């Protein structure tokens, strides 16, 4: 099975050298790789294949999500092929980004993980700069690069220090290891390491790059940003908690408070957004704040809840960005003040908006509800005083979801809207691919909650 996976990963490079039908090749091979990923998930709880590749439930769950989202990105970006907007270059970029992300999730080596973690920045910037919408995309790329690099360089220094002190860079070796470092040094190392991941997440106060990047990115860029790239930060935090578990317990109250206050603040910011993509981007900050608060509780229940939230948010936020792109093609605007009457113009699209808006606000039977219940209980177990912030977060999340839905679908129809809505089979397939795992995983939740 491992050999089959390696062969298929190598075959994914074919679109780089084949001139004909690059979309079909990448789509087919990505679909073939997905069942391989699930078969490996059902193997041992932790398996180390080589010095540079290992797996457990979290890494393979996120790898499967990466492949699934990549397939949907290709389906959502067929306009690039039809308009001949450098389709081969686009496919090459997507395949490179896919390989980087899978290597990042499967790497047990701390230094290699950092290299793949940073390498994901390059294809993302190429996506925004080459296929972005507005001239401001250069500013968005600059924000993304400066925030990520500025936070990651101190983290690299800490990782090198860990390697020198422990004489190993293998993350599984950190589980029961005692480091000969005093408390202030460990505290500084934890803060610098956490900073690099919190910017990628991003957490409130270091989130300004995210709305800019989402607004200027093409549909494929928004999907991969929301569904996968933000999860690199959460994945890194969960991995490093095995090394800094004592420091995490001593700082969890402060950091969780900041994360929950940020979740409430970004939910309030969502209520006054007029740009649809910006609203969805800010909602991601709120959900990731709740996720990091649960992860920092350092309990098995919190770890499982954080992973469940990453999977649930990856599917729902990707779907919201796909539908935002469909709305833009119908109305030629992203403004919630101008985007009115879609219930009359596109009732099928309205149905999909209702389903995924409900999923985003954690309504049953979505896995978002499961993840939020698990996160709230894990946080309240450690600190009952957090129930006020958790209640406000849940309330304002529902409020901005209803505001987003009613602003677009009710009211008089815009005169500038496309009179013949084009809801194609491709769009129906895309939305179904988002909805099916969101609903079905609730019947087998151990797929996303059995890691600890």
UniProtKB/Swiss-Prot annotation:
Gene that this polypeptide is encoded by: ND4
Any one of the GO BP annotations: electron transport coupled proton transport
UniProt similarity note: Belongs to the complex I subunit 4 family.
The protein's Enzyme Commission number: 7.1.1.2
Entry function: Core subunit of the mitochondrial membrane respiratory chain NADH dehydrogenase (Complex I) that is believed to belong to the minimal assembly required for catalysis. Complex I functions in the transfer of electrons from NADH to the respiratory chain. The immediate electron acceptor for the enzyme is believed to be ubiquinone.
Transmembrane segments: 7-27, 57-77, 95-115, 116-136, 145-165, 186-206, 218-238, 251-271, 278-298, 303-323, 336-356, 360-380, 386-406, 428-448
Major subcellular location class: mitochondrion
Chemical reaction(s) catalysed: a ubiquinone + NADH + 5 H(+)(in) = a ubiquinol + NAD(+) + 4 H(+)(out)
Name of the featured protein: NADH-ubiquinone oxidoreductase chain 4
InterPro entries reported for this sequence: NADH4_N, NADH_UbQ_OxRdtase, ND/Mrp_TM
Keyword tags: Electron transport, Membrane, Mitochondrion, NAD, Respiratory chain, Translocase, Transmembrane, Transmembrane helix, Transport, Ubiquinone
């Amino acid at each position: 099975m491992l050999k089959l996976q390696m062969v298929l990963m190598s075959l994914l490079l074919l679109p780089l050298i084949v001139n004909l039908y690059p979309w079909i090749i990448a789509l087919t091979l990505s679909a073939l790789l997905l069942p391989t990923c699930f078969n490996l998930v059902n193997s041992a709880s932790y398996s180390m294949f080589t010095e540079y590749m290992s797996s457990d439930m979290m890494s393979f769950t996120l790898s499967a999500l990466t492949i699934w989202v990549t397939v949907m990105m290709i389906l959502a970006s067929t306009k690039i092929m039809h308009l001949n907007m450098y389709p081969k270059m686009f496919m090459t970029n997507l395949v490179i980004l896919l390989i980087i992300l899978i290597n990042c999730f499967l790497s047990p080596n701390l230094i290699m993980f950092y290299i793949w973690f940073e390498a994901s920045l390059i294809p993302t910037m190429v996506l925004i700069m080459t296929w972005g919408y507005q001239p401001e995309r250069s500013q968005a790329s600059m924000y993304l690069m400066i925030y990520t690099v500025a936070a990651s360089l101190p983290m690299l220094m800490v990782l090198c220090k860990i390697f020198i002190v422990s004489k190993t860079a293998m993350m599984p070796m950190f589980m029961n290891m005692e480091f000969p470092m005093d408390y202030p040094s460990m505290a500084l190392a934890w803060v610098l390491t956490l900073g690099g991941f919190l910017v990628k997440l991003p957490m409130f106060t270091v989130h300004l790059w995210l709305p800019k990047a989402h607004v200027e990115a093409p549909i494929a860029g928004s999907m991969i940003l929301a569904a996968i790239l933000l999860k690199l930060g959460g994945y890194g935090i969960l991995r490093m908690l095995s090394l800094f578990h004592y420091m995490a317990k001593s700082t969890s109250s402060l950091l969780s408070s900041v994360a929950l206050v940020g979740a409430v603040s970004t939910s309030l910011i969502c209520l006054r957004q007029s740009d649809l993509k910006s609203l969805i981007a800010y909602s991601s900050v709120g959900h990731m704040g709740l996720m990091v608060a649960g992860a920092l509780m350092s309990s098995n229940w919190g770890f499982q809840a954080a992973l469940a939230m990453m999977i649930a948010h990856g599917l729902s936020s990707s779907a919201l960005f796909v539908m935002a792109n469909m709305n833009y093609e119908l109305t030629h605007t992203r403004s919630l003040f101008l985007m009115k009457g879609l219930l009359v113009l596109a009732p099928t699209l309205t149905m999909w908006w209702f389903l995924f808006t409900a999923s985003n606000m954690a309504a049953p039977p979505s896995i978002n509800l499961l993840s939020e219940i698990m996160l709230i209980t894990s946080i309240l177990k450690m600190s009952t005083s957090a129930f006020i912030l958790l209640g406000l977060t849940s309330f304002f999340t529902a409020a901005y979801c209803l505001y987003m839905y009613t602003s677009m679908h009710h009211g008089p129809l815009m005169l500038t809207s496309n009179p013949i809505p084009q809801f194609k089979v491709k769009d129906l397939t895309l939305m179904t691919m988002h909805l099916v795992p969101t609903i079905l995983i609730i019947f087998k939740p151990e797929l996303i909650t059995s890691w600890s």
